[in-house]
Amino acid sequence: MQVTQRWNREQAISLFNKPFFDLLFQAQQVHRKYFRLGQVQISTLLSIKTGNCAEDCKYCPQSSHYETKLDNEPLVQLPQVLAAAKKASDAGSTRFCIGAAWKKIHDRDMPLLEQIVTGVKAIGLETCMTLGILKPQQAQRLAKAGLDFYNHNLDTSPEFYHSIVTTRSYQDRLNTIENVRKAGIKICSGGIIGLGETISDRAGLLVELANLPEPPSSVPINMLVKVRGTPMFDNKDVDPFDLIRMIAVTRIMMPTSYVRLSAGREQMNEQTQAICFMAGANSIFYGRKLLTSSNPTEDSDKRLFRKLGMQIEKHTTIKNSNWKKKKLLLHDNQQHDNTISS
């Protein structure tokens, strides 16, 4: 179900400026209307190609433009990806996300990516990828393989964007999101706070997302993880109340989207995370590592969920017809193999 409203920046800013408890109350009302209280969706993120990225995103340690002492890693192959996906499934994740430090996907990598989607779905997980700029025909191929989600963040407002990135335009990002939408893949798109942006920039980001033809199915809200060697290492820390306000306004403006408390959780105490969940966050990344940054352990997340009385949401995705056919073929082949071996 999609609930859409055209937003303008003034309306969004007025939400940010609400008294804190009034804002929290409104966000909680919206959250209770469209989601089960106390349910959290769990994703696991794997980097299949780390570092040496041609982009100059000022927040990112994977950029080749900065000296961050990050160990570059080559492309991970299918068996290692599927082993990681199985481990994520066993730990309780319902979605497996694949990231690569690319500006764009090369056609030569498409067969591997298609095999990854098919293999991960055979494990029973939803699939998500974040691989940079995506051309229409590439989006269609990934959709045919069964890809559920594609992540492509807008990062910040259109006005502030070029202070952060110069190697990819804002329109490039919007074009990729449109290619994803037209291919029938669900959109995952959000942004980062702590880049030096203003309240107006945060409002502008959310207006862009909320006013897409279809708001994203999933909206990750990242808090800047400062890495020595990047231009943003000396940025001011994000005030926890600013993060909570960002979560709450996101929930109000995109009532049916999953709001993911994403990068930066390792720097948050349990109380901050709890209020973020109260403000409308209902998704997290699970596992010790997010691309290159640390993340709370599964055990610490489970302890927090127990304290809050929260439960992991069960996997309910309906697979597309192409995937159903592939699943039936896979099942038939397995039955045939069992007959031969018996």
From Swiss-Prot:
It is an enzyme of class 2 (transferase). The keyword Thylakoid does not apply. [2Fe-2S] cluster binds at residues 97, 128, 188, 260. [4Fe-4S] cluster binds at residues 53, 57, 60. Its cofactor is [4Fe-4S] cluster; [2Fe-2S] cluster. SMART domains: BATS, Elp3. Binds 1 [4Fe-4S] cluster. The cluster is coordinated with 3 cysteines and an exchangeable S-adenosyl-L-methionine. Binds 1 [2Fe-2S] cluster. The cluster is coordinated with 3 cysteines and 1 arginine. Pfam families: BATS, Radical_SAM. Keywords: 2Fe-2S, 4Fe-4S, Biotin biosynthesis, Iron, Iron-sulfur, Metal-binding, S-adenosyl-L-methionine, Transferase. One of its GO terms (molecular function) is iron ion binding. Its EC number is 2.8.1.6. Residues 38-262 form the Radical SAM core domain. InterPro entries: Aldolase_TIM, BATS_dom, Biotin_synth/BioAB, Biotin_synthase, Elp3/MiaA/NifB-like_rSAM, rSAM. Pathway: Cofactor biosynthesis; biotin biosynthesis; biotin from 7,8-diaminononanoate: step 2/2. It catalyses: (4R,5S)-dethiobiotin + (sulfur carrier)-SH + 2 reduced [2Fe-2S]-[ferredoxin] + 2 S-adenosyl-L-methionine = (sulfur carrier)-H + biotin + 2 5'-deoxyadenosine + 2 L-methionine + 2 oxidized [2Fe-2S]-[ferredoxin]. One of its GO terms (biological process) is biotin biosynthetic process. Homodimer. Belongs to the radical SAM superfamily. Biotin synthase family. Catalyzes the conversion of dethiobiotin (DTB) to biotin by the insertion of a sulfur atom into dethiobiotin via a radical-based mechanism. This is Biotin synthase. It comes from Baumannia cicadellinicola subsp. Homalodisca coagulata.
